[in-house]
Regions:
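Alpha-helical transmembrane segments of multi-pass membrane transport proteins
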Residues: 1-439
Length: 439
């Protein structure tokens, strides 16, 4: 059978199996086993265990459970609430200070936890009631936190970037740096829209800040600064080449766990057990998807599907930006239905030869891909962040949360357009700090 036709058959079968309710990892294994057995015989099928475990035999993968534990330690404390409170007190005189504080807190907590749902929950519990109390529109209150939570997969340290780096064999440290300026761009766009939307809907009074004494401003800092110093240290170790991502993540997790115990008195063994249990579950889920995606990629390569698609794309007489438009549409649709890790592991091995062949920078593309995945986090039918916000603020209808999030989707699309027009936003800082990339 022609590899391109076989590729369409694989895609259709994968969609059918994943929509049947089976987990992503098991679905990828089932599809891989079916097609290897049908078109390559038992010889390839027997190699599945070797590929499965071989994919996990990677030192860089150790950073995933460590960063997850680091985020869980922070999320198990009041660090998010304290961070929000600190920014609110210090930025109260800034125009639209509260919404700026919320989004700033989302960005910083995302850098500390690396988790979008955790960011939504931690900042939303404090931010949404306070914004409603100060007469911010419900759509702005819910939408800004839902959108701010998505920054967890872009702003370093990001599990999504680690997975992309492993899937495409690119530098994880460089990927982290590539996400910094685009992350700040997104935060700026989110802030601009939030302030404009509040002003447009007549919420002028909501933009006026409260007054805090210097004592009130300084008393909250001792609970926040230690965590921020850990994050700065982690990023310095990564960017400065002091340690590998896995080593840095392990030290960061240990320090955050220690700070949670010392500062927030998290000494209850039950709480620590729940934190370790949930971190382990999330880590195993991601690692299982990575292993299954390795088998899926092996199947695509063994049946010459990946190579045939790349060759076919290369023969098309199409402008490379038109090609990028099609890729963005594909990623956007995939992000509506699948978690970011699954999309990256399934799509990156196929798309990377196409991206390189078209002359695009793989680190710039990582940012584009991640922003597309962010859109999926606040878009139905999955829209995980929407449901997190609905869970912590049930008095706000889900429809209001969704409509309030749509302008932030537009902000992300604008960010993608800006990055396409000015790719240096994603590539300048990595080139400055780590030298020119070799692709």
């Amino acid at each position: 059978m022609d590899p391109l036709v076989l590729g369409l058959l694989v895609a259709a079968t994968t969609i059918f199996i994943l929509f049947s309710g089976i987990s992503v990892a098991n679905g990828l294994l089932v599809v891989s086993a079916i097609f290897l057995l049908a078109f390559d015989g038992f010889r390839s099928l027997e190699l599945i265990p070797e590929v499965l475990f071989g994919k996990l035999d990677n030192f860089a993968l150790l950073s995933i459970p460590m960063f997850i534990l680091m985020g869980a330690a922070i999320a198990s404390t009041r660090a998010g609430a304290d961070l929000y409170e600190a920014l609110d007190r210090w930025l109260t005189r800034v125009p639209g200070g509260l919404v700026v504080s919320n989004l700033g807190a989302c960005a910083l907590f995302a850098a500390m936890s690396g988790s979008s749902p955790a960011t939504c929950a931690a900042i939303g519990k404090m931010g949404i009631p306070e914004m409603r109390k100060r007469n911010f529109p419900d759509g702005v209150a819910a939408g800004s936190i839902a959108a701010g939570g998505t920054l967890g997969i872009l702003i370093p340290p990001s599990i999504t970037m680690i997975v992309y780096g492993i899937a495409t064999e690119t530098s994880i440290g460089r990927l982290f740096i590539a996400g910094v300026l685009p992350g700040l761009l997104l935060v700026s766009l989110f802030m601009a829209w939030s302030i404009f939307a509040t002003w447009r809907q007549g919420g002028i009074d909501a933009l006026a800040g409260r007054t805090f004494s210097w004592k009130e401003k300084f008393e909250v800092l001792p609970r926040v600064i230690p965590f921020l110093l850990v994050i700065v240290g982690v990023l310095y170790a990564l960017y400065g080449g002091v340690a590998t991502p896995s080593e840095t993540a392990a030290v960061g997790a240990l320090l955050c766990l220690g700070l949670a115990i010392i500062i927030y008195k998290m000494t209850d063994l039950g709480t620590i057990w729940v934190m370790l249990r949930d971190s382990t579950k999330e880590s195993v889920m991601i690692l299982f998807i990575i292993a299954a995606a390795g088998v899926f990629s092996y199947m695509l390569s063994s049946l010459f599907i990946t190579q045939s698609i790349a060759t076919w794309i290369g023969t098309l007489e199409v402008n490379r930006w038109v090609l990028m438009l099609y890729i963005n549409i594909f990623l956007l649709v995939a992000g509506f239905f699948l978690p970011p890790v699954a999309v990256i592991l399934m799509a990156a091995p196929i798309l990377m030869p196409i991206i390189l062949g078209a002359g695009f920078d793989p680190y710039w593309f990582a940012v584009i891909l991640t922003i597309n995945m962010e859109i999926g986090l606040i878009s139905p039918p999955v829209g995980l962040n929407l449901y997190v916000i609905n869970g912590i603020a049930p008095e706000i209808p889900l429809k209001t949360i969704l409509t309030g999030s749509l302008p932030y989707v537009a902000c992300m699309v604008i960010a993608i357009i800006i990055l396409c027009l000015f790719p240096g936003i994603a590539t300048w800082l990595p080139d400055l700090l780590m030298g020119q990339a070799v692709t």
